Amino acid sequence: MRIKVLTTAIISSLLLTACNDGSSSASSTQTGVLSDSYVKGVAYSAAPSGKTGATGTNGEFDYLAGDTVTFKIGGVTLGSVNMSNTALGLDSGRLMVRPKDLAGVVDETDEKALAVAQFIQTAAAALPSDTRIDVSGNAGKFTTADTVDSLDKVGTLATAAGLSPVSLEKVSQHLLNAPGNVKSVEFTPTDITGLSDANRALAYTTSTVKVAYTDGSTKTFPLSYVNLFNNIDTGKTADGSAAAAIRDKNGHIINDPAGKPYVPQTPDANSLMDVGGTPYLVTHYEYVSKDSAGTDGYGKVPMAMTLAKLSQSKTDGKLAVDSIKPVDFSGVNGLWIPCAGSRSPWNTHLGSEEYEPDARCDASVGDATYAASSSCTGMEYTARMNAFRALYGEATASPYNYGRVPEVTIAMGGASTVQKWYTLGRLSREKVQFFGDSRTAIQGDDGTYTHLTLFVADKARNLSAGTLYAAKWNQLSSDGAEGGKANLTWIKLGHATHGQIKAAVDAGVKFSDLFAVDTSGGATPVAGFTRVKHGHEVATVEDLKLNTGTFAGVPIDTLAAFLETCRYAALKGATVEFEKFEGVAYNARDNKAYAAMTRMANGMENKSVTSTEPANDIRLKKNGSGAVYQLSLQPGWFDSAGTAIDSAFVPVVMEALVVGEDMAADTDGNKSRLDKIASPDNLFFSERMRVLFIGEDSGNHVNNALWAYHVDSGKLVRILSLPMGAESTGLQVVDNLNGHAYIMSNYQHAGDKNSTAQATFDRIKGLINTDKAEVGYLGGLPAMR
């Protein structure tokens, strides 16, 4: 459909030109538009036609069919664009070149695209509200031949020209308010009323998307769920093994006690990336639900990511798998329970390691009493750590090796490398989400009695050093409110380099090197100790005192901040009361972030401060259906000590935006209203669609769903129903990959019982292959540009 529209527009333009000069369409001059709003004064040269000039008031430039056009401001090359590229947008029927096209990337918020936009706007002294900008006044200041390939380069070029770079916050606002081909998008709902058992056993959609274009036309596109591959597929791996088969540090497949390979039923995060013109897909596998005998394997098996090389149909955009191979984690001590993830603005994959092992449970600490307590046995930390070490072949691995951010970089040709970063703290990280400066990120901490952290890297797209902060919730809404609202203040936990923290872990740092623990159990802590409560599935109350001195040359307080982030945050007075803090997302145009809370319970309820409840910052009504929160980002903020936070993207207000609603169980076992979200988990915001996508992980909906929340209208619609008991995972939206958009969506652990009524469960369970889980996407969308 998109190609037909595009072709029609181009043919119409050619026919009009041909009527005017009598020449053939192949040799007729065509007009394109350079758009970051409309950009005047940029020099261009087209080859092979030889056409040259400067862009006009509305960004116009001339070219012939088949030309590649190069754009410059002074001596600085912005990029070159093949005008035959089907991914280019349209402006009133004319092909439109955007900063992402000049940068050779597919995403408007990619760091390279932002760098090109920042340079253009700096040269034009642009304001976010400007609809036309002019670089001609400053073009002569850029006399040296150079290119724009990074944000750092923009700073260097601007300084040399005597200009101040436009802030990235303003760059994003201006860039995303600039003209695009798509004016608005609206999804229609998938109605599950009276849905057949057969359709409740699969990924099911009847939704459409109505796209309104800037030329006044509208098109409606039906959605369909497209399977890329299953976890158990054997046809695309080099050795014929299952796609998700688990391997040890030597690359050998790990077998269960029955001699059959461990194959997880839990595909999670996806990062669909364009690398040198080839699409690749990184996929997480979170945990092994069960082995071949049905024995629970959660957390006791090393986990995996795969890298799939894809091909894309040039006609309908359909993706297909060429090959699948494992990502090698042997150089970083293996991979522990990877949950959600994100594609970084610099086109790498940023993963997670959820439910990090409690280092106080480890035998090296020598705290047998604690190791035998429910804080350790409730999550089986000791059993999991020992099983992981044995199966992966990392006998001496420290608990502090896990709970990290693994970054996967894909090179041209498909080779992958992994770096685990120790600078973003150690927590039950659901997902790390970077903002427009490629330095600032927020992180959700999944579990009960958890916290919200902010990371600010020293340098853009470089995670080797940075500062970590934890949030304090200062409630504005009344006690017992539904969802609630609060101002956020930020407590600095510390600054560190990756090398510092990793060296201490390699040197054998233990929990007891960081903290003293008083176990006398009095109603109040003894002098010098602070009572804190933190946890995952099991909340732990501890009386802690930070040790003094250094370990491996690193101050103990710094190590505590980056090795025991949640404990240390609680010790410093941050709010450690959030409940199942899940996915996060970023809206660049509005400078907002979003965060999912599976439920508001336990620490988030209004409660009395007692010996077992040391804090009551969050005082909300209990809600088992959860909510999505909106966080307003601001520049010029200070931490709790009065020191400036070096970021223009600091969350300062947090309030409930989309809230679920509990109900009495219906005949199927649904315990949350079916027209509202239940237990939100995965989040992703599409800049061009202006839609926040919400994936569920709920026992309160028999069939979890993927929802589309239209942020401008507030309309919420279900666009995908998942198999009974399955969790919606792998959520990522790519607005434009070579002329097509994709909503990546997987599901895991289909057939789980949860709250499903027994009769309903018995009817549907037999229709589901519980060993199978799908990696796929919602297809049928045109490019959103």
Per-region residue spans from a language model:
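Generic hydrophobic, helix-prone segments enriched in Leu/Val/Ile
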Residues: 10-12, 113-134, 148, 305, ...
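Conserved small-residue
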Residues: 184-785
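Bacterial Sec-dependent N-terminal signal peptides
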Residues: 2, 8-32, 59
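Short amphipathic alpha-helical segments, especially helix-boundary/capping motifs
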Residues: 13, 126-155, 379-383, 406-407, ...
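N-terminal hydrophobic or amphipathic segments with adjacent small-residue motifs
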Residues: 3-6, 12, 53, 328, ...
